[in-house]
Amino acid sequence: MSKSFFSEKVCDEIDLHMLIRIQAEVEFYEFLDKAHSLGFHKVRIITGKGLNSENKQSVLKPFIQGILKKEKLKFRDAKLNEGGSGAIDVWIY
């Protein structure tokens, strides 16, 4: 993929951290549908880093990554100054 593909600006974001999985999944799909219908190409999903979880590991991040893989969407961790491992940038072409 070209460098310009990854440098595209984030159009919108949703903060899912502090939600339970089922609630996060519903919110995620609603957000993705809306972003797609608005013609957005790159969005950010905030999952949190897991600092408030019992074992200090993110519960939502691997869950959301699994959904993204299932949906065959391109994604990566946000840049360090934009959320780092607590956020995922998603391309929805």
Protein language model features and the residues they cover:
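Long, charged, low-complexity intrinsically disordered regions
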Residues: 1-93
